[in-house]
Amino acid sequence: MKALLDLFKQVQQEEVFDAIKIGLASPDKIRSWSFGEVKKPETINYRTFKPERDGLFCAKIFGPIKDYECLCGKYKRLKHRGVICEKCGVEVTLAKVRRERMGHIELASPVAHIWFLKSLPSRLGMVLDMTLRDIERVLYFEAYVVIEPGMTPLKARQIMTEEDYYNKVEEYGDEFRAEMGAEGVRELLRAINIDEQVETLRTELKNTGSEAKIKKYAKRLKVLEAFQRSGIKPEWMILEVLPVLPPELRPLVPLDGGRFATSDLNDLYRRVINRNNRLKRLLELKAPEIIVRNEKRMLQEAVDSLLDNGRRGKAMTGANKRPLKSLADMIKGKGGRFRQNLLGKRVDYSGRSVIVVGPTLKLHQCGLPKLMALELFKPFIFNKLEVMGVATTIKAAKKEVENQTPVVWDILEEVIREHPVMLNRAPTLHRLGIQAFEPVLIEGKAIQLHPLVCAAFNADFDGDQMAVHVPLSLEAQMEARTLMLASNNVLFPANGDPSIVPSQDIVLGLYYATREAINGKGEGLSFTGVSEVIRAYENKEVELASRVNVRITEMVRNEDTSEGAPEFVPKITLYATTVGRAILSEILPHGLPFSVLNKPLKKKEISRLINTAFRKCGLRATVVFADQLMQSGFRLATRAGISICVDDMLVPPQKETIVGDAAKKVKEYDRQYMSGLVTAQERYNNVVDIWSATSEAVGKAMMEQLSTEPVIDRDGNETRQESFNSIYMMADSGARGSAVQIRQLAGMRGLMAKPDGSIIETPITANFREGLNVLQYFISTHGARKGLADTALKTANSGYLTRRLVDVTQDLVVVEDDCGTSNGVAMKALVEGGEVVEALRDRILGRVAVADVVNPETQETLYESGTLLDETAVEEIERLGIDEVRVRTPLTCETRYGLCAACYGRDLGRGSLVNVGEAVGVIAAQSIGEPGTQLTMRTFHIGGAASRAAVASSVEAKSNGIVRFTATMRYVTNAKGEQIVISRSGEAMITDDFGRERERHKVPYGATLLQLDGATIKAGTQLATWDPLTRPIITEYGGTVKFENVEEGVTVAKQIDDVTGLSTLVVIDVKRRGSQASKSVRPQVKLLDANGEEVKIPGTEHAVQIGFQVGALITVKDGQQVQVGEVLARIPTEAQKTRDITGGLPRVAELFEARSPKDAGILAEVTGTTSFGKDTKGKQRLVITDLEGNQHEFLIAKEKQVLVHDAQVVNKGEMIVDGPADPHDILRLQGIEALSRYIVDEVQDVYRLQGVKINDKHIEVIVRQMLRRVQITDNGDTRFIPGEQVERSDMLDENDRMIAEGKRPASYDNVLLGITKASLSTDSFISAASFQETTRVLTEAAIMGKRDDLRGLKENVIVGRLIPAGTGLAFHKARKAKESSDRERFDQIAAEEAFDFGTPSAPAEEPQHPAAE
């Protein structure tokens, strides 16, 4: 009986734990795990197939091969369990212990663990303070290392060659000790006194001044402190005992034909054992030192290969010349333990099949093939059969199901009812890639899918397959029904738009039904109600598009909200509408007016319609409405009978003339080129321009002809109406196709690009209707093939970006309702070049206001701080013209180890405030990664047509208002009385009467201001003008010009204008100066006052010096009088090269990886006055003197464009050298808000170009994760080291503790990490190891004795617990609460007992129970 009870006991609950710690195992620890030493390299006996004793598969060490049976067969059956057979030494127990029992190998000579030696930076090297090269020479027996110098002048850890060693031995005898091999290294490690070393290092760190030393000491200190804290001894990095993996985890499987398939590990272990045994024998035989040494080296190499094959030297190979797969290879990479088995598991109760369309289904249903359902729900059916008494045993039930008796189908129906299943379509790029549906049993073998969910799954019916999963437990079913049911997921989490938008046929049907035609059959009739219209339509008295008058009953929300009053009341109105729209009004949900349907329904309109329905009528009504829209759309599209034929592609008659004119113009350019009037490049650019314009013109002519048709109205007059051409209707409604595609069918194909992206100058003038000739067809193949190649690359790159994003954000979960912060960001409409790119309402919708929103007219509070701004609120804000609202953002959230709901705002996929437990990090990553495949891969060359877009030369106001300048705007008044701008970052704003900003424009340096601060202007007024082709250098002081180093032929050259014959001086490049000229002088101007003294900068002793850049055209003469604001020189901007703009996916990756751009612009570190110092070779020295008089130097390459010149005042963070911005500089000089604005805007630019809508908050969430580490600048009394990077939450916790104890907290700087780096530097070593660089992460974690608190989602998935998000978060919270209350109760009981009994006396003799055998 007891045995049986024990059997049941074995299915014990897994232990509950809250953290996992990793460390180094000491030799004793390894021996304690082991069940015996593996002494022989043999595996199994080839005749008996029994494992050899003491071999790698030994049953005595690892356990029996069959359950409860020893090897020799003396003891069989359960009754002997636990007995150890005296004949073969095998314990009688379950065979599965062979999966968990380890063995060990006692190494005859210690061996260094390769991970701690070779994984960079070498940990052994750090601890010993020796170079990797030296340690390797010692370990692999090429050199000696001094261990005890004794009384000799040698130093400890000194490396000597063999020759050296023998000389020293002759010299000093045995005064000193030197060793080679791992023994020597082990001795050195043992000799280290960690506490003492840490003390000396800390003092050294305080006293040293050199950067390099500080870095070196800090690194070493970190490693040593880790050893000190974790209690791990450094000498454990040298192995004396090698653990042996349980045999079932490195199996040996017999194949047919008497051969064996074996795990590579067995080979590697065999080599180690062979070499170890040989070494033992050599040592016993007292073999010569050189032989022993060689054997020890070979043993070291064998162990290296076992642990990480190929890390050092050549990889060990098996019989077939491929490298053997070592222990390290088992866990790393895509096929390793982490990614293959722990993060990606296969699941039971699942099936897959092809999908077909199910237009008759409701939104929450899917059609499940009967046979599939039968297989998936088998256990449920077995249970039902037994309960009903149809079958007595499981076996009988199985037979019933196999025979598919009628009763089985009835039961299947019953089992399936109300039991949702989950459908998944790979690739699952966002959370809508898995949704739950209620199954409907169908015949056939294909799954039926509702058409409206296709958009979310990105599915089509051209052979796509989907997988079905069955949620088993009641909790799982509940979650599937409440959270994942398709009808509960109608919004995209990325942007809050509806995801159940009709497409293709449905759109076409609805569009066709809601179009209006002039003089349709029955036009002008009036009807009393919709039913009458339907009757007339069914009797062919009217057409769908005829204009008629109908009385329509709308259900409007009741004003009377008292008890018992109905929610909606009918309202009857006579509308002028069309037959189709009237018929559609039948399905309008309660609460929506008919006006939403009373227009042609194009795709965008339908999307807006569903969105309005969701906001006004709620989820249920919307789902029903969408379903009915779909049914109607399909029905109407079928009735419409729209088809395409060749005649629908109307080629415009004026095409030939347009193309002919273009060809003439091109000939003219060819002639000019031949005459040498234009360069080849200009000719090419112009030709391309002409053809693209021609293409546009033909397209326009074609669309004009296609989009309207002549028609006779009721009065017999001819008018034009929108065309009922099939192709036009498809494109116009948004069902299929676009203007560009129609242009290729009926206009001209236009210009094609070569594979390298350059445009071929001869266009394809034909279209598809006319047909292409051979050459045209050939040119077309370029694009088609490049498209396919790009798509393949794009998918991989996009997937990798998503993976990195998920990894960096996976632990970000909403953990509380409100963190109570008063920080936020000021949101304004996004304006580029005076155009509103994104309205304020879109940017603040669904966010929480952080300051009261005040009505600018009445100054009363509209919305208090802490209000979630919904549609009504943002519409009101927009109506009142409020242009700036401060809102909460994930970036400033003060919650530690998570986010709070208020800072995140609305959950876009649900339309309400985000719930605690929502995994917002993963959602953000999915929202950014999912559209990745739609982005382009290419970098754009700005050349030809694009770059010659008109260069702006003035700004004008777009609205009426008052001119205001930003604080950075500075200008001087010149002799003519004009205001000349002398600041680099000045901006002009237009504000309305309430002081609200309406628009803002950048005004460049050197511009002439036409309006001053405070001027009232009308729309269209010019604010400032400037010369677009040159950049001026302007003097801020008056005086007499005095040239310095302006020598013709040395620093400047004379240029004579061919046309005007005037001469100007041009500053020449240093490299082009004559040999005799000094390279360091730079041409500059000083100003003299009336007395001939140099003019000084006010308030300083510096003389005004204005330097000229290379390429500057000097416009003043020596000795000329100049006034304030006069132009001294001009720099032509023509010289700007056409830069490649990184676009698309690579740009997004570049931003999130926080890479510094190649030629980054330089920002001013401080506010102060600029001056130029002495130039070095190829660099110019720019000095900024701050207000205290301290000087900050920048060295700038000569070819860079310096945006400032002498004696100019710049503000901190202003750009002083032209180039793309470096995000790290922005963070350092302008702060978190500026950085976030930069990254959000730049990422959005890329997506906006592709027409992809993503909410800003997703990008902000990622930026928050990129900023999650800080760098300690002063450690105060904390445990950190200056210069160390630590997790922000950790540091804040530590600082709180310091303040509580009255000690000094640490101060820190923000650090921006790229997403890969941030993922790897996370506190969770499990998460980091499963991402990339597994070896390095694990090595580091083991030395530090890191503990993983299982905070993120990934760690929990890997260890197999519920993830701490959603219901899992609640589960863990409840569990922890219960544990702590249990502990309290336990303490209480213990206290009471002690109290009751005083001191417990000696325990009474326990009565002997009869044994329960």
UniProtKB/Swiss-Prot annotation:
Catalysed reactions listed for this entry? RNA(n) + a ribonucleoside 5'-triphosphate = RNA(n+1) + diphosphate
Q: What does this protein do?
A: DNA-dependent RNA polymerase catalyzes the transcription of DNA into RNA using the four ribonucleoside triphosphates as substrates.
Q: Which InterPro entries match?
A: DNA-dir_RpoC_beta_prime, DNA-dir_RpoC_beta_prime_bact, RNA_pol_asu, RNA_pol_N, RNA_pol_Rpb1_1, RNA_pol_Rpb1_3, RNA_pol_Rpb1_3_sf, RNA_pol_Rpb1_4
Q: Which residues form a coiled coil?
A: none
Per the record, the similarity remark reads: Belongs to the RNA polymerase beta' chain family.
Q: How is the cofactor bound?
A: Binds 1 Mg(2+) ion per subunit. Binds 2 Zn(2+) ions per subunit.
Q: What's the protein name?
A: DNA-directed RNA polymerase subunit beta'
Q: Where does Zn(2+) 2 bind?
A: C819, C893, C900, C903
From the UniProt entry, list the residue stretches annotated as the region Disordered.
1392-1413
Gene name per UniProt: rpoC
